[in-house]
């Protein structure tokens, strides 16, 4: 049980996919303009990453390895992720049309989010079992969502702030992201793995 908790805390805070591994930067910068959109994208990405991590484990251990076609891993995982994203898109369209409109083009772009593929590949490369794969996917997605929501809240406040003209827009956003990364570095000594 402790091992699972350490894996979860490690992926959320210490080895954050956005701030440490630099995966998922496109939606991090693109969807963080409004807090409401960031929350929706975070929830959708959390669902997709967790489910894709579990499905990728099953694909790897029950199809790719037994058939001796592990060299098709990346292609197979992209296919799994595309199916999971389409399923998520259908669920969001039916359950929350407003969120579906807010997310717009970013929902199908979860398919190309390198963080989702990164979770699947890294989970397999680190030889996680099925439960660890799910926890790793959920932890990575929770960390992604946490950073995305915090960053969106900061960007909303920066719009009203008196920022010097050369630093407005993307410049102050990148500085803020760098400061967030430094803040998350403080968690590095929290767990010794």
UniProtKB/Swiss-Prot annotation:
Localization: Cell inner membrane
Residues passing through the membrane, by range: 5-25, 39-59, 63-83, 102-122, 134-154, 171-191
The entry's keywords: Cell inner membrane, Cell membrane, Electron transport, Membrane, Translocase, Transmembrane, Transmembrane helix, Transport
BP terms from Gene Ontology: electron transport chain
Gene Ontology CC annotation, any one: plasma membrane
Record's bilayer topology term: Multi-pass membrane protein
One Pfam family here: Rnf-Nqr
Superkingdom: Bacteria
Location, primary (coarse class): membrane
InterPro entries on file: Ion_transpt_RnfA/RsxA, NqrDE/RnfAE, NqrDE/RnfAE_oxidrdctase
EC number(s) recorded for this UniProt protein: 7.-.-.-
Reported function: Part of a membrane-bound complex that couples electron transfer with translocation of ions across the membrane.
Family statement drawn from the similarity comment of this UniProt entry: Belongs to the NqrDE/RnfAE family.
Known partners and oligomeric status: The complex is composed of six subunits: RnfA, RnfB, RnfC, RnfD, RnfE and RnfG.
The protein's name in its UniProt record: Ion-translocating oxidoreductase complex subunit A
Protein's organism: Aeromonas hydrophila subsp. hydrophila (strain ATCC 7966 / DSM 30187 / BCRC 13018 / CCUG 14551 / JCM 1027 / KCTC 2358 / NCIMB 9240 / NCTC 8049)
Gene name for this UniProt entry: rnfA
